[in-house]
Structure formats: C-alpha cells, structure tokens
Amino acid sequence: MFDTNATRLPIWGIGCNPWTAEHVDQTLASGNDIC
C-alpha cells in the first residue's frame, strides 16, 4: 500500500514517532489511530 521508505517518514503528523511499514500496516488493518 505504501512505499517502505515513504512509510518511515513522519508523514502521520507532528508529535508522532516514525513507524515501520509493518507497524503501519497492522495499525491500519486494526483500525486504530496511528498517533
């Protein structure tokens, strides 16, 4: 869904830690907020 390098960038908002692509996929799949 996302490019691996792109997902590691802090594109999720200020104050959020950089996530790995795997974590982002799991978070989006579970429907939880990333921040």
From Swiss-Prot:
Cross-referenced InterPro entries: Amanitin/phalloidin
Propeptide position ranges: 1-10, 19-35
Covalent cross-link Cyclopeptide (Ile-Pro) as placed by the record, residue numbers: 11-18
Positions where (3R,4S)-4-hydroxyisoleucine occurs in the chain: 11
Note: The typical symptoms of amatoxin poisoning are gastro-intestinal distress beginning 6-12 hours after ingestion, a remission phase lasting 12-24 hours, and progressive loss of liver function culminating in death within 3-5 days. One of the few effective treatments is liver transplantation.
Residues joined by cross-link 2'-cysteinyl-6'-hydroxytryptophan sulfoxide (Trp-Cys): 12-16
PTM summary: Processed by the macrocyclase-peptidase enzyme POPB to yield a toxic bicyclic octapeptide. POPB first removes 10 residues from the N-terminus. Conformational trapping of the remaining peptide forces the enzyme to release this intermediate rather than proceed to macrocyclization. The enzyme rebinds the remaining peptide in a different conformation and catalyzes macrocyclization of the N-terminal 8 residues.
Modified residues (4-hydroxyproline): 18
Modification (3R,4R)-4,5-dihydroxyisoleucine, positions: 11
Name of the protein: Alpha-amanitin proprotein 1
Function: Major toxin belonging to the bicyclic octapeptides amatoxins that acts by binding non-competitively to RNA polymerase II and greatly slowing the elongation of transcripts from target promoters.
Lineage per the UniProt record: Eukaryota, Fungi, Dikarya, Basidiomycota, Agaricomycotina
Pfam families according to UniProt: Amanitin (PF24112)
Family per similarity comment: Belongs to the MSDIN fungal toxin family.
Keywords: Hydroxylation, Thioether bond, Toxin
A molecular function (GO) term: toxin activity
